[in-house]
Amino acid sequence: MTKKLIVISCVLTILIGLCGCAGAVKYPSYYTLHVPPPPDPSAQGNVHAILAVREFRSPAYLRQGAIVYKTSPEQIGFYNYHRWATDPRGFVTNAVADRLRAGGTFTQVKPYDGRPDVDYVLSGQLEKLEEIDYEGGVKVEVAISAQMVQLSTGTVVWTNSVSEAAPVDKRDVPTVVSVMNHTMEQAIEKLLAPGPRVSIQQSAATMRGSQ
């Protein structure tokens, strides 16, 4: 009888332990990138050109979903329980396209689908989006590059790159993400200042070619 009680007691202890472990399951927190929306589109003037925007590329480690930090230039770490809700590449692509659309330089700005019914194609790369934990203190770094090609000639008519960094006052992931958002906004603004431009001569040639 005593042995049975001991066995039952052990089983109950194990079950209680398992329940405790189940209650301690940790779920990921998800974060979004956000920048203020661009102003309403301005008047288009005499330029009549269509721009297609390819999805921005990025290094493989930025496509894993987890927020990235670096403890040295060579070492990359991941916050496995702090992840992006959406792919940062798609966010940057849409944010850049929205601002180009609002700039009024092009009659239409649309996602690139491989069709030749556009005048220009813009492509780019999100090169850095990470927390930096070396060189004293904590900061975030965002780096973006882009170029625009005239489809009819294959000529690169515009290119730019930018790298922005900002300190993080409080080291926790929500604060890091907030600083990343602000730094991303600055990086996109500088990338597109000055942004792609289309001359009236190029626009006129495009119109003649489409007739």
Task: List where the protein language model places each region.
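A structural "domain/chain start" motif
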Residues: C21-R89, R197-Q211
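C-terminal motif of bacterial Sec signal peptides marking the signal peptidase cleavage site
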Residues: I16-G20
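Generic short beta-strand segments
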Residues: F56, Q125-L129, S163-E164
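Extracytoplasmic/secreted envelope proteins and their assembly/folding machinery
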Residues: R89, T93-A97, G103, N181-I188, ...
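Surface-exposed short loop/turn segments
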Residues: A22-P41, D98, G103-T155
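Bacterial N-terminal signal peptides that target proteins for export
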Residues: M1-C10
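Short secondary-structure boundary motifs at beta->alpha junctions and helix caps
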Residues: E74-R83, S152-A193
